[in-house]
Design a protein with these regions (language model features):
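Loop/turn-rich, solvent-exposed surfaces of beta-rich toroidal or solenoidal domains
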Residues: 257-259, 265-282
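Extracellular glycan-recognition modules
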Residues: 95-252, 267-270, 284-292, 298, ...
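GGW-centered surface loops in extracellular recognition modules
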Residues: 10-110, 170
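Short, hydrophobic/proline-enriched secondary-structure or compact coil segments at domain edges
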Residues: 41-56, 129-133, 171-172, 276, ...
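Fungal secretory targeting signals
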Residues: 1-9
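Flexible glycan-contacting loops in extracellular carbohydrate-active proteins
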Residues: 287, 292-333
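Short beta-strand segments enriched in hydrophobic/aromatic residues
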Residues: 175, 262-264, 329
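Extracellular structured ligand-interaction cores
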Residues: 44-46, 82-90, 95-97, 126-128, ...
């Protein structure tokens, strides 16, 4: 099972990412992108934009099956419209119907949608727009940040891993536009805006959090950013004391675009702490992906004390199977 998102991308092959995953025996159960089709034959809508002027929406297709998004449709629909457009829906291309919409906020509010035209890029000679996330305070008149985030979710999914079931998550995100805390996530989360305790999430987070993570876990080596796994009650770069390398090149420059992957396996007699791996690297390089961590899950104490302690352990996992993008499981954001 795989979850896949491309927030930004600048290269494509003949096969889509989800074609490659399917050949490996882990077909995508959710596939989201505003920049391209995730399958070579996909011809449905990639996302929907909403005009702020009249609240009307328009689906945005690819220029051709398997191709990049057709930004000319966005420009024609949104250009000149007072206040522009936001991204209303990011469609699930996998066929499971796991579409992403603005999540519920607190006190009756709804999370904010991202600006649909804030971040243009070129993909195969075509202009495309990424989903560009900004802090709540960049939105004039928005509710207090404690009441809303800028993000999308789906609490009623199909086929997404639950409990200690294995899963793989894949994302391409900006390597230069990130936060320094929790939580800008993509992946598996609670099915509501609550914190259900350790091990109830499994999501990718790219951040330069210099504070380390909760429960004594270690942030990565160097200046960051790093690929974290948000497992709820903690962002982790490996286990409790793993100095993962930064997402930077040999000259210490951050990558323009980052590929991030998390592979999570369940606990077993041979691996009572479970097993997970984190990969990351330059999304624009053919050989840019490298293993950043491969080993047991984090532990709230020394084995075997942390095994099977309910809310005090990240193994076995207790995933809910919800989906989030841009926020944490309890709607937190950094």
């Amino acid at each position: 099972m795989a979850l896949a998102v491309l927030v930004s991308a600048i290269t494509v092959s003949n096969d889509g990412p989800c074609d490659i995953f399917a050949r490996g025996g882990t077909p995508c159960v959710a596939a989201h992108s505003t920049t391209r089709a995730m399958y070579a034959v996909y011809s449905g809508p990639l996302y929907s934009v909403r005009r702020r002027l009249d609240n009307a929406t328009m689906d945005i297709p690819a220029v051709a099956p398997g191709g990049p998004a057709n930004a000319s449709v966005v420009d024609a629909y949104c250009e000149g419209a007072a206040l522009g457009c936001t991204i209303a829906v990011i469609y699930d291309q996998s066929g499971h119907g796991n579409h992403l919409r603005a999540g519920p906020g607190r006190r009756g509010h709804v999370d904010l949608e991202v600006n649909a035209t804030a971040d243009p890029h070129t993909l195969l000679g075509r202009k495309v727009y990424s989903a560009y996330f900004e802090p709540v305070d960049m939105y004039p008149g928005a509710p207090h940040p404690k009441e809303v985030g800028v993000g999308y979710r789906n609490d009623n999914t199909t086929g997404v891993a639950k409990g200690d079931e294995p899963e793989t998550l894949y994302a391409v995100m900006s390597g230069t536009h990130y936060n320094n805390g929790c939580c800008f996530d993509y992946g598996n989360a609670e099915t509501g805006i609550f914190d259900a305790g350790d091990g109830t999430m499994e999501a990718i987070s790219i951040t330069a959090d210099q504070r380390g993570t909760m429960h004594g876990s270690h942030h990565g080596a160097g200046p960051g950013p790093w690929v974290f796994g948000d497992l709820e009650q903690g962002l982790f770069v490996g286990n409790n004391s793993w100095p993962a390398p930064s997402l930077r090149d040999a000259d210490n420059n951050t990558f323009s675009f980052v590929t991030a992957m998390i592979k999570g396996d369940g606990a077993s007699p041979a691996a009572p702490l479970g097993h997970w791996a984190i990969k990351g690297g330059d999304a624009t390089a053919a050989a840019g992906l490298r293993t950043l961590y491969d080993g047991p899950r984090p532990c709230a104490g020394k084995p075997p004390a942390c095994i099977n302690k309910g809310n005090q352990s990240w193994s076995p996992m207790r995933k809910f199977g919800g989906l989030i993008l841009g926020i944490g499981g309890d709607n937190s954001h950094g």
